[in-house]
Regions:
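Alpha-helical transmembrane segments and their immediate juxtamembrane cytosolic regions
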Residues: 1-248
Length: 248
């Protein structure tokens, strides 16, 4: 890792808080506005496609979704940091899998208005596969620090699995996590690589401005706060699902 400037002020806890807030903003648009109003209106014929662009809620939705694009890049970066610094990869992976299971029904309720929808899976599965991919890259790393072909094949398999089951951000999410892991020794290269790979989402590369100012410290985070960060995803999805259901 390149030397960090003393002017860099964002701790890991600060970045995680920003990621959670922007994710909430994004999901208000995706769940309450899109799944709760726009999509039902189009399906019922009460809202035409031609009028959609002039619809005030459509414009609000665009603002919310563009703001929310910052969340996933931050979570990917923080996942890499967590993997690099954890002393228990199995425990780290286990928590992600556990919350993937706990979050699936809230995810389906929030975005598909049904408790069981197998067409898409929540982001915890993408993060879990990202950890698996990084574990493979680390296991088969060469003495010069470059990834071995076995590790690349393993990571590719994890990305293929994400694509097959359609996790949130699917294969590209896993591949971006791997790229951030492989470029972790140079913050400038890591930020540039991440920003370039997220160009498919207009505002997502801006997340790496925040990453650039990461100070390399975990920051104040009590055991309760750590648990709260894990629980935030399924709980906020349940709340949004409830709000959306009241709107229908």
């Amino acid at each position: 890792m390149t030397a960090l400037s003393p002017r860099r002020t964002f701790s890991g806890t600060a970045l995680k808080t920003i990621a959670c807030i922007t994710m909430l903003v994004d999901h208000i648009g995706a769940s309450c506005i899109e799944a709760g109003i726009l999509t039902p209106g189009l399906d019922a014929g009460t809202l035409s496609q031609d009028a959609l662009s002039a619809y005030p809620l459509y414009r609000l939705d665009m603002v919310l979704r563009f703001t929310g694009r910052l969340a996933f890049p931050l979570f990917c970066f923080l996942l890499v940091e967590g993997f690099v610094h954890t002393h228990n990869v199995k425990g780290y992976l286990g928590r992600l899998v556990l919350f993937g299971l706990l979050s699936e029904v809230p995810f389906d309720l929030a975005f598909f208005r049904t408790p069981f929808d197998f067409s898409a899976q929540n982001v915890y599965w993408t993060l879990a596969l990202g950890v698996l991919a990084m574990a493979g890259l680390k296991r088969f790393e060469k003495e010069n620090g470059l990834p071995g072909w076995q590790g690349l094949m393993w990571a590719g398999g994890c990305a293929a699995l994400a694509l097959a089951v359609n996790t949130d951000y699917h294969a590209i999410g896993v591949l971006i996590i791997c790229t951030l892991y492989l470029t972790r020794a140079d913050r400038k290269r890591q930020c540039l690589a991440g920003a370039l790979l997220f160009l498919f989402e207009l505002t997502a590369p801006l997340a790496f401005v925040l990453v650039w100012f990461y100070n390399g410290q975990r920051g104040a985070c009590s055991p309760l706060q750590k648990k709260a960060f894990y629980w935030f995803y399924p709980v906020h999805l349940l709340v949004l699902a409830g709000i959306t259901n009241l709107m229908l």
